[in-house]
Structure formats: C-alpha cells, structure tokens
Amino acid sequence: MKNINKYILPLIILLFSIQLLDPKEVLTQDITSGESQYEEFCSDCHSLTLRGTAHGSSLIGKQFIEKWEKRGFQSLFDYTKESMPPGQQGLLSDKSYKEIHNYILASNNKKTDDSWVAFSDPNTIDQPNERKTNFKNKVIKSFKNISLEDINNPPSSDWLSWRRTIDGQGFSPLKIINTENIKDLKLSWSLSMNEGSNQVTPLVSQGIMFLTNPGNIIQALDARNGELIWEYSYPFPKGSRTLGGPTRNIAIYEDKIFMATYDASLIALDVKTGKLIWKTKKANFKDGYTHTSGPIVANGVIVSGINGCERYIEDGCFITGHDPDNGKELWRTSTIANPEDEYGDTWGNTDKVFRAGGDTWIPGSYDPDLNLFFIGTSQAKPWVADSRGMTTKDSALYTNSTLAINPNSGKIVWFYQHIPGETIDMEVGFERVLVNY
C-alpha cells in the first residue's frame, strides 16, 4: 500500500494543478503556437499576413469572415483538417489544427474556441515529424567524379540530368527492354518515400540512385536492390515552408549533389557521404520565394531559377548562376524588365515594385555547342492586365518567354515571347526540349 500511495499523491497534485490552469492563459499560448505553425505550414500559399497569394485565398477580412460565419467556424476547422496542407491532409494533430484555427480567428478579431481538447484522443498528442530509426549513414566506397563530358554525353546506363541529357530529350538509348520482352518485367524491389507531393526524376550513376523525397530529403540507394546507403534531411529554419511540395530535380557534378530548397536556398552535398558541403541563401523565403525545381549544370555553372514571385517586392523574379565549389553567386539575371532596362516600357508606367511574375518553376536545358542555357518563364502577376494598371498591348517582358542565357555571364543572348500581354493565366514555363534541324 505504501508503494501505491507514493504514486497516487503526485498524480492527484498533477490533476489538481491542471484544473487550476487559466483557460485564457492556455488560449493565449494556443494562439502563439498557432501563429508559429501557420508560418510553417500555411504561409507559403496564404502569405504571412493571411492576405493570400495566387496559390491560396485570403484568410482575413470581411469577405472571409462573412463566408464562414454563414457556414459556421466549426465548418472552417473541419475543412482545414480534411484538406490541408495540400497533398498532406491530416499531417498535423487535432491540437495543432485547433491552434492554427484559433490564430486565424484571433487575427480577424473573432472569438476563438476556448474549449479544451480531449487528451484521450491520441491524435491530440504532437508526434515528431522525423522518422526515428537506428539507421546510420554509410559511405559510397567507390565513385568516379562526374565530368562535364559525362554531363553533356552521359553513358547509356546513366541518368545524369532531369531528362537524362542536358538538352532535355528524356531519351534512353538502352535496348535490352523492347516490345517483345516488356510483358515479362517483374518487380525487383520497392521503397516507400516520404509522404507529400512529388514529381521527381531520380539520378543514376555507376549503379547508385540519388532520389529526392518531399521535405527536401535526399537518399543515395543501391540501384540493384534499393538498399539505403545514406540519407540527408534538410533542416528548415523556423517559420519556413515545410509542406513538401514538388522538388522536380536535383543535379550532380564532380563530387557533389545540388538541391534547391523550399526556403529559397541552394545546397551542395558530398556525393559519397551525403554530408553538407555548402549552403547559399538565394532569397528570403519570408518574401514568398521558394523552389519547385532544381538546378542544371551548364558549362560548369550551377544555374537555377526561382518562383513565388507574385508578391510586390523590389527584387522580383530572377535566375542565378553559382560556383559549384563554394556556392558563390556568379551572376543574377532578372526575368522582369525593370523601368531602367531596354524593354522596361513593355510594362507601361508600372512602378518596379509592382512588376511581379516571371517565375521559372521548371528546370532549364543547355546546349554545349552554343553554350546557351534555355528556360521558360511564367505569366505576369496578377494575371489580369487591368489589375496591374496595364493593357494587353503591354507585353510585359520577359514573362511568358523562352530565354537563352550565357551560363558564364548571365547575359540574355536572345528571347522569344510566346504570349505577349497575356491576361488569362496561360503560362509557358515548361521544359525546353532542344533538337537540331
């Protein structure tokens, strides 16, 4: 009995202390926590100010409140839990969804839900987002550095770029699998990837597969059996987007793997160990900048675009070239013609800060004979010309264009605008497949 009493007394004290907590104090803590979680999981689409972007509606203001007052704020909570984050519904605990819900209501000066969450529900207990395993990274013992010649003319058994060859052809010369034996193919191995939205093409070199997962996780696998050799998980800064949107490609060159991250940085990993070699911040993710595609190796320069450029800021959208050895930015080329530029008048009299868009959300291509990097740009933002103080006669260069860029200088050698003055969300930011004729 003495041993039982030893545990009962502290338990009674704990339960009594819980009852003495001030619900208002708990609610204030919830709103603070909700703000932090909103920044991490929601702000990329709905903005840090809750005013929305081209990718997510506004969560603040008269129209938003009137809509959900009619339906009931419980319906807002249910909708958020069932459909958010996109592609990762139910990612958070009930407690986290409630805290985000209360933060949104508080931001609209609306009474928040101060009801207690029932801790008998296991979903109310926050679970760590990281996978806990006993796995320890191993080292790729033998790996020959990837040369420019390899990049430009990859061995038939390797896939060294997003579409195998740097010209974007996406063609494999292998002939073992054909129309006669394809019916006999069988599953050799499978591997569960990290949850989330993904559109990646793995890279393969010397029997090693390099695979990027949602959440900016890169894995090195033995292509013969799927055995994990090493894994790198990018550590996001507080408040950055970690929704796990598409990371369409990574790049490989010499002894490094290159990845463009969700929080607008560029990193290089050691190809044998997966350890971080360098990191370069390209832009501030709090301004909306992010990556959904990665870099291309063009004549020894790591070239990549950026997106998330619908917000009104001075810098606008751009393409950068980086030194593969240390990540140093070699050049930066705007995809928006600014007022002082040669084609600045194609935006009418619009001030520089209001010239938005020109995102590059698909990787580029490269022609080593011409030494030109090709990439497509998306539309001007907002989509409707009149909302930008422009007309459809204002072509808004260099949006909806193909850009041909010297990868060593960043100079736009030539461009072609496919849809001048576009105003109905028809963009051309797709892959550029290069052919000789």
Predicted regions and their residues:
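Sequence/structural segment immediately N-terminal to covalent heme-attachment motifs in c-type
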Residues: 30-48, 96, 100
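Flexible coil segments in periplasmic/lumen-exposed cytochrome c-class electron-transfer proteins
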Residues: 89-167
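Electrostatic cytochrome c docking/interface patches
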Residues: 22-37, 88, 143
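Extracytoplasmic beta-rich repeat domains
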Residues: 190-203, 231-251, 279-294, 334-363, ...
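Beta-propeller blade signature
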Residues: 269, 316-328, 395-409
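Aromatic (tryptophan-biased) beta-strands that constitute blades/sheets of beta-rich domains
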Residues: 138-193, 227-239, 275-284, 328-336, ...
